[in-house]
């Protein structure tokens, strides 16, 4: 466990990713007991704690994914918003570290082993002014390391991302910064395991200062270039170096290195994106062997992982810290107050004598400069109408006066305003974490907000809310405690109309199916019985303004009228002339009232006089029906105005 760099430990009743610090107890006695402690630091936090090795486990990507899936599917009461954000940020940092380590390990799997190097000679050895062709042949045929190995050795001390170097910087400054040497010497032709270990130590000795001091942009050598001694003039330096100075170490015996030992120009990037011109002579790549040319075309990425092996842990830690500092906070913390009001926004509104209270904008009428808002309450109905207010009376929820408005509301309704703020905060946290996407009203109606809503609905009687209208223009009920919301009462639909329809169905069956009123109607048509409805019909004008049918259901009325039309046709046209030829009017004004009165008398077992009075009174309407009818008239009048 102590060999692991990152672990997963329990802290504050949660599994947190942490980094194992130095100084952890590793005694053999404790290891046998499995009771030694680990010094760890929570990722993305400065908190350092001690945990038992038995309670910690090596951090893996699978653990992070399991924790993330459990967070997305949790249904319990959410933690504090800031703690939730901190925990999720720590998990994200751990996932980034694991991905980075996985990427570096995959690159190291294809990296060739670092070449062996010889001890470097002082830069004071003067190089020869020219190179003979015989020397080139000897060098090309020597069993020394290949060109690609020397290139890897040359770049192994560079940090990742610094392979592209610039030319044009004076080579004397490069000698001063790097201690007079910028490139490793040639590798020995023969060597065993001891030579390899010695070369590794020597290579680390001269590469460590380079990682600390930083690379000079002019340290990349060009193929076929030599370094002029510092005692020579500037003109000789310019002539010898060409596009930029380079530093090559001479082998033992005072020989100069072949131009094959330098790095190819095609692997070094310039600012202008061009390569320095090559010299056609012993320095020209055209005279290189086929093996060297093939190695010259190998990509630079093969040598990149070597640089990661020589990077100090402090450099890696500094890179991680810079990434953490550059992280942007969640968008919910970077809120800027908008200039206009839109549908779904959270606002403050002052209603009557109560303090400013949070509300949701349901609709906006730009032309009238008004908006419909719905106050956030314990028993808020997301489908409520809300109240119409002027836009200038609204304030954005995150305005500058937010804290003052909260303090004012806490004076009388501390518990209620605290619940409203917690509901809004939970909504914004879920938006930022991506666990919910939608408006606030959709969030309130969804199951994801039930834990927060239940916390107030279970104690709605003891929580004091302001008596806000919630869309109803009525004032608070007289006699109720001031500032306390009345108990919620479910309103059942009115069943009076259905009861009357069932009673009238008996009258229809008596008239149509039983034909109980047919003899009474025939007697009236033949003038055997007097009828006040027939007298009114004959003495009235041609047009009637209103007809009382008594039957409220249209299907029942259609059945009775069709039956009366048949009775009227069977009676003949004797009374049709006196009825001005209007059969429909005769049926509705004479036959329909007489048939219904006869049915009421028979079904209710009352005399004709009582049944006639009941017909004239009409159906008995309930108080609920009268109230609904009055409200419909008011809405119609307001719509016309």
Swiss-Prot record:
GO cellular component terms, semicolon-separated: cytosol; nucleus
Subunit structure: Interacts with TP53BP1 (via BRCT domain); the interaction is not dependent on its phosphorylation status. Binds nucleosomes. Interacts with trimethylated 'Lys-36' of histone H3 (H3K36me3) (in vitro).
Pfam family, one: PWP3A-B_N
Protein name: PWWP domain-containing DNA repair factor 3A
Gene from which the chain derives: PWWP3A
Family, per entry: Belongs to the PWWP3A family.
Annotated CDD domains: PWWP_MUM1-like
Predominant location category: nucleus
């Amino acid at each position: 466990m102590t060999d692991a760099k990152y672990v997963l430990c329990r802290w504050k009743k949660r599994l947190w990713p942490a980094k194992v610090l130095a100084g952890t107890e590793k005694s053999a006695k404790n290891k046998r007991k499995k009771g030694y402690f680990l010094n760890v630091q929570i990722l993305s936090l400065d908190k350092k704690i001690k945990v038992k090795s038995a309670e910690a486990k090596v951090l893996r990507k699978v653990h992070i994914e399991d924790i993330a899936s459990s967070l997305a599917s949790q249904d319990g009461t959410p933690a504090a918003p800031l703690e939730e954000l901190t925990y999720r940020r720590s998990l994200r940092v751990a996932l980034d570290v694991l991905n980075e380590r996985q990427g570096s390990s995959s690159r190291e799997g294809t990296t060739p082993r670092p070449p062996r190097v010889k001890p470097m000679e002082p830069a004071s050895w003067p190089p020869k002014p020219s190179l003979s062709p015989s020397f080139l042949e000897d060098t090309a045929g020597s069993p020394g390391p290949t060109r690609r190995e020397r290139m890897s050795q040359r770049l192994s001390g560079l940090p990742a991302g610094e392979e592209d170097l610039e030319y044009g910087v004076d080579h004397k400054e490069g000698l001063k910064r790097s201690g007079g040497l910028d490139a490793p010497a040639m590798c020995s032709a023969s060597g065993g395991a001891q030579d390899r270990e010695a070369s590794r130590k020597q290579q680390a000795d001269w590469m460590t200062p380079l990682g600390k001091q930083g690379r000079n942009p002019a340290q990349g050598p060009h193929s076929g270039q030599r370094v002029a001694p510092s005692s020579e003039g500037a003109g000789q330096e310019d002539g010898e170096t060409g596009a930029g100075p380079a530093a090559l170490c001479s082998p033992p015996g005072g020989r100069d290195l072949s131009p094959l030992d330098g790095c190819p120009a095609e692997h070094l990037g310039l600012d202008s994106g061009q390569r320095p011109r090559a010299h056609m002579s012993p320095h020209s790549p055209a005279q290189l062997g086929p093996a060297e040319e093939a190695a010259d075309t190998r990509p630079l990425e093969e040598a990149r992982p070597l640089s990661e092996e020589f990077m100090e842990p402090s450099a890696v830690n500094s890179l991680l810290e810079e990434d953490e500092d550059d992280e942007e906070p969640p968008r919910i913390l970077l809120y800027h107050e908008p200039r206009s009001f839109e549908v779904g926004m959270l606002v403050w509104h002052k209603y009557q004598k109560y303090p400013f209270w949070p509300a949701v904008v349901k609709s906006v009428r730009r032309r009238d400069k008004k908006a419909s808002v719905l106050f956030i309450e314990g028993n808020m109905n997301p489908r409520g109408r809300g109240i119409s207010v002027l836009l200038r009376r609204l304030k954005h929820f995150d305005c500058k006066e937010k804290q003052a408005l909260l303090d004012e509301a806490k004076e009388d309704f501390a518990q209620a305003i605290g619940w409203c703020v917690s509901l809004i905060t939970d909504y914004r946290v879920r938006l930022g974490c991506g666990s919910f996407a939608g408006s606030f009203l959709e969030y309130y109606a969804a199951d994801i907000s039930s834990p927060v809503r239940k916390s107030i609905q279970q104690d709605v009687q003891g929580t004091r809310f302001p008596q806000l209208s919630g869309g109803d223009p009525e004032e608070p009920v007289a006699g109720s405690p001031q500032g306390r919301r009345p108990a919620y009462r479910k309103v059942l639909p009115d069943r009076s109309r259905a009861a009357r329809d069932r009673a009238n169905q008996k009258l229809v069956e008596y008239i149509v199916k039983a034909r109980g009123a047919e003899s009474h109607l025939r007697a009236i048509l033949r003038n055997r019985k007097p009828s006040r409805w027939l007298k009114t019909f004959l003495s009235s004008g041609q047009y009637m303004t209103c007809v009382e049918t008594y039957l409220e259901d249209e299907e029942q009325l259609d059945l009775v009228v069709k039956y009366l039309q048949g009775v009227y046709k069977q009676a003949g046209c004797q009374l049709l002339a006196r009825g001005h030829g209007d059969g429909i009017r005769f049926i509705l004004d004479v036959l329909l009232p007489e048939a219904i009165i006869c049915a009421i008398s028979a079904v209710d077992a009352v005399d004709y006089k009582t049944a006639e009075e009941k017909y004239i009174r009409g159906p008995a309407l309930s108080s609920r029906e009268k109230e609904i009818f009055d409200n419909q008239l008011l809405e119609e009048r307001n719509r016309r105005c």
